[in-house]
UniProtKB/Swiss-Prot annotation:
Endpoints of the signal sequence: none
Known function: The coatomer is a cytosolic protein complex that binds to dilysine motifs and reversibly associates with Golgi non-clathrin-coated vesicles, which further mediate biosynthetic protein transport from the ER, via the Golgi up to the trans Golgi network. Coatomer complex is required for budding from Golgi membranes, and is essential for the retrograde Golgi-to-ER transport of dilysine-tagged proteins.
GO molecular function, one term: structural molecule activity
SUPFAM superfamilies recorded: ARM repeat
Protein's organism: Arabidopsis thaliana
Major site of localization recorded for this protein: cytoplasm
Annotated protein name in UniProt: Coatomer subunit beta-1
GO biological process: intracellular protein transport; vesicle-mediated transport
Quaternary structure note: Oligomeric complex that consists of at least the alpha, beta, beta', gamma, delta, epsilon and zeta subunits.
Length: 948
């Protein structure tokens, strides 16, 4: 039998106390030394030591002591020691303590009486308790409430013993009388608890006869009342109507704990709209009134559960839920937004967006550290609202565009992605968005935000004025050309006597010029304009945000600038009738592109231009020099069509996910029938009628029946020993979120009784055994079940191994049967999850642990291999289907999952098909902790070869 521990005491194993030292201290007259010795003895007992020689010493020298601390420690000691022999009979020496316990129960000091009564609550031996029953009963009438409340608990514990009802035949009647006369709140609560536990009918009768007074009862008593109601309604569901009235009355209680329990009880007992609405309102009120963040998070979890099961009712309370955003805690705000976004409808969208806009404005105050992160969450929420309900986009897009220059790059990136989607899905807003973007473009200082903003300018500037404004804005943000002077180039290259000539492909003519020191140098025509220093003055329009970024070596941005200018020039050709103006603009664009190439190949630049950016800019130069209709169509139409296709796929994916969620809805074709008219009312309240209707619907739709998958249960059984071993063992493994439960069936296959049989387990990885192994006796050819709990603290592949050790009467030595290892699968702890591309990239950059697994598989199709990896790792593919379809010989995809411990698992699959048809490449796993990266890597290595 597993023993329940009533205390936890720290014990330093490095300094074990010797039994003789303890004995000497106990025999002395020093009270402090006795206290210290008793503590050491208790610690030894708690850690599995048996010190039987101390028992008589304690009876002689400790039992008579009047010191309260010693008496308390004595009771702890008596609780811990073994009181029975191997056959379950009480040891004869235990009778010695009965007289002392009786004396304590009649002691003039109420503390001694109280702690002794509390000790009796934990006594399971009827032979020890029986002689004490008269003294226990006398304490029911003691003047002090501390004694009375513990006397009631002692009677309850004794009454629950196997033969307890014979020791206290009329205990329920006595306690019922006590309950009617008792004035102490705690004693009254204990009395009601005793009736609820031992005589439920009496408790119910007392409750129903005092219905009007329930709301005035003490908080602890009200909590027991709710527990009783839950218990009664499970066994007698037909009677829950009258109890729900009591719960509704308790919703107005002063105690927050009672109100919370009332709401939970209502939800568990009834699915009637009135009951659910009352519970949801209660949670929302508590959410605003409670200051503890942990309490708020628990309440949000309850609201999330209600949203999942009763969305229609929760929709009415969305504004109440959103009020939780007033909390400065980011976790609370994130959960609040997650719940609210699923409750948005056409009726409440305007209110919700208005509230979110107010919150965005509040973040500009800059008082809190994490305002940027909170603003990012709000922007993402508004984005989701605008995608679901395009009509609200016009009310928020201009407000959010003020944050394009936000110092929080992630927040600014979310804004620009939002603007990009809205300008495509809401054509009416195109003109106002472009105008606002061109006006505020100079404020954008983030290298990740500028490319997206430039793409929007290149794609959506359609009229002549817009195209000209777009080109003008880009030119101003680049500043004066070139990006450096020749004198600046010579400074970092003092070791070189000559200035490296610029490639002839980039210049049209050369001529000698006189430098500042009087020497001659060759200069290209591209450098004939006034020289400007690469020093950037922040915040000024003329300094140019694009210029500043280019001078830091961001040539990917340079390639985007070149592409945007190319698109604008091609569109200018269509809307501008004057060829002269077009040619001027082409020349200006070419000058900018050549200057960027010149900067990229100059030692002034901190980083040389990369090949991809170089080729892209050169392509733009060639295109502007040799324009044709086919290229114009590709640049002006095909790029936009690709984006439109991407948005359409995203919307389709979201619709499919929404459909998948709503497939579990319980709406039926006959929902419109008013069942109330078919019921005989019989004085039933509205809530009772609703509840009965809901139960009928559940019964009709089969919601009350739940099938157990026995086949699945059998699959979890692991064989631990061989059939030829003297002891056969198999384990059924149940994996919970934070622990693993092992149910080990042990069969004695011999003709002898196995004594001191013990299941010894050990773990490897982040697994910990919760309890100490117990010894058992197993009869010949009999079986027994041994349970073991193992705590899991992280997502890491763990191993459980061990032995079964036993003794027989014939052999003095212990026999050992080695068990097969039990491997705990990481797949039990991770589940597919979704995150934005920006969030994925941010985490990818931040996470320090990476595990790189080489592709080694017999699968020859790229998509088939990816699907196999997704299935094997239980992850979600974040890459759009359109990006990975087709036969192009290579594939790259991102996968994401989350563990039950909140850990993120990121996987990037990059594969290429070789000429012989085999796949090669790498699967890279990144995570914050080493365990999940290694475990996932091992899993992929194991699974990637096969197709099963």
């Amino acid at each position: 039998m597993d023993k329940s521990s009533t205390m936890l005491v720290h014990y330093d194993k490095g300094t074990p106390a010797v039994a003789n030292e303890i004995k000497e201290a106990l025999e002395g007259n020093d009270v402090e030394a006795k206290v210290d010795a008793m503590k050491k003895a208790i610690m030894l007992l708690l850690n599995g030591e048996t010190i039987p020689q101390l028992f008589i010493t304690i009876i002689r020298y400790v039992l008579p002591s009047e010191d309260h601390t010693i008496q308390k420690l004595l009771l702890l000691y008596l609780e811990l020691i073994e009181k029975t022999d191997s056959k379950g009979k009480v040891l004869p020496e235990m009778i010695l303590i009965c007289q002392n316990l009786r004396n304590n129960l009649q002691h003039p000091n109420e503390y001694i009486r109280g702690v002794t009564l509390r000790f009796l609550c934990r006594m399971k031996e009827t032979e020890i308790v029986e002689p004490l029953t008269p003294s226990v009963l006398q304490n029911l009438e003691h003047r002090h409430p501390f004694v009375r409340r513990n006397a009631i608990l002692a009677i309850m514990s004794i009454y629950k013993l196997p033969q307890g009802d014979q020791l206290f035949v009329d205990a329920p009647e006595m306690i019922e009388k006590v309950l009617s006369t008792e004035q102490d709140p705690s004693a009254k609560r204990n009395a009601f608890l005793m009736l609820f536990t031992c005589a439920e009918e009496r408790a119910v009768n007392y409750l129903l006869s005092n219905v009007d007074k329930v709301s005035d009862w003490n908080e602890s008593l009200q909590m027991v009342v709710l527990e009783l109601i839950r218990s009664v309604c499970k066994t007698k569901p037909a009677e829950k109507g009258k109890y729900i009235k009591i719960i509704i009355s308790l919703l107005s209680a002063t105690s927050s704990a009672v109100i919370y329990e009332c709401a939970g009880t209502l939800v568990s007992l009834s699915s009637a709209p009135t009951a659910i609405r009352a519970a949801a309102n209660t949670y929302c009120q508590l959410l605003l009134s409670q200051s503890d963040n942990n309490v708020k998070l628990i309440l949000l979890d309850r609201l999330y559960e209600l949203k999942t099961l009763h969305r229609d009712i929760m929709v009415e309370l969305i504004i109440d839920v959103l009020r939780a955003l007033s909390s400065p805690n980011l976790d609370i705000r994130r959960k609040t937004l997650d719940i609210s976004l699923d409750l948005i409808t056409h009726h409440n969208i305007n209110e919700v967006v208005q509230m979110l806009k107010k919150e965005v404005v509040k973040t500009q105050s800059g008082e809190l550290e994490k305002n940027g992160e909170y603003r990012q969450m709000l922007i993402q929420a508004i984005h989701a609202c605008a995608v679901k309900f395009p009509e609200v986009a016009s009310t928020v897009v201009h407000l959010l565009m003020d944050f394009l220059g936000d110092s929080n790059v992630a927040s600014a990136l979310d804004v620009v992605v939002f603007v990009r989607e809205i300008i495509e899905t809401n054509p009416k807003l195109r003109v106002s968005i472009i105008t606002r973007l061109l006006d505020t473009f100079y404020q954008i200082r983030a290298g990740k935000v500028c490319p997206c903003a430039l793409w929007i300018i290149g794609e959506y500037c359609l009229s002549l004025s817009e195209v000209e404004s777009g080109i003008s804005t880009i030119t101003q943000c680049l500043g004066e050309l070139p990006f450096y002077s020749v004198s600046e180039e010579s400074e970092p290259t003092e070791t070189s006597k000559k200035i490296q000539p610029t490639s002839s492909a980039m210049v049209s003519s050369r001529k000698p010029v006189i430098l500042a020191d009087g020497t001659y140098a060759t200069q290209s025509a591209a450098s004939e304009t006034t020289f400007s220093s690469p020093t950037v003055v922040q915040g000024s329009l003329t300094s140019g945000n694009l210029r500043a970024l280019l001078l830091t070596g961001d040539f990917f941005l340079g390639a985007v600038v070149a592409c945007t200018l190319t698109k604008l020039v091609l569109r200018l050709e269509e809307v501008q009738s004057s060829k002269t103006e077009v040619n001027k603009t082409v020349t200006q664009a070419l000058l900018i592109m050549v200057s960027m190439l010149q900067l990229g190949q100059s030692p002034v630049s901190p980083h040389p231009i990369d090949n991809d950016s170089y080729e892209r800019i050169v392509l733009c130069i060639k295109l502007l020099c040799h324009r044709n209709d086919e290229m114009k169509k590709i640049w002006l139409e095909s790029c936009r069509q690709s984006f439109v296709k991407m948005i359409s796929e995203k919307q389709l994916r979201e619709m499919e996910e929404l459909k998948a969620k709503t497939q579990t809805t319980h709406a039926q074709p006959d929902d419109l029938i008013d069942f109330f008219h078919l019921k005989s009312r019989k004085g039933m309240s509205q809530l009772e009628l609703e509840d009965q209707v809901q139960d009928d619907l559940k019964r009709a739709t089969g919601e009350f029946t739940k099938d157990e998958n026995d086949a699945n249960k059998l699959n979890r059984i692991l064989q631990l020993t061989g059939f030829s071993d003297p002891v056969y063992a198999e384990a059924y493994v149940t994996v919970h979120h934070y622990d693993i439960a092992l149910e080990v069936t042990v069969i004695n296959r011999t003709k002898e009784t196995l004594q001191n049989l013990c299941l010894e387990l050990a773990t490897m990885g982040d697994l910990k055994l919760v309890e100490r192994p117990q010894n058992y006796s197993l009869a010949p050819e009999r079986s027994m079940q041994i349970k073991a709990n193992i705590k899991v603290s992280s997502t890491e592949t763990g191993v459980i191994f061990g032995n079964i050790v036993y003794e027989t009467s014939n052999v003095m030595e212990r026999n050992v049967v080695v068990l097969n290892d039990i491997h705990i699968d990481i797949m039990d702890y991770i589940s597919p999850a979704v995150c934005s591309e920006v969030a994925f990239r941010t985490m990818w950059a931040e996470f320090e642990w990476e595990n790189k697994v080489a592709v080694n598989t017999t699968i020859q199709n790229e998509r088939e291999f990816l699907d196999h990896i997704i299935k094997s790792t239980n992850m979600k593919c974040l890459t759009a289907p359109s990006a990975i379809e087709g036969e192009c010989g290579f594939l790259a995809a991102n996968l994401y999952a989350k563990s039950v411990f909140g850990e993120d698992a990121l996987v990037n699959v990059s594969i290429e098909k070789q000429t012989d048809g085999a796949l090669s490449g790498y699967i890279r796993i990144r995570s914050k902790t080493q365990g999940i990266a290694l475990s996932l890597g091992d899993k992929i290595t194991l699974k990637q070869k096969g197709s099963s």
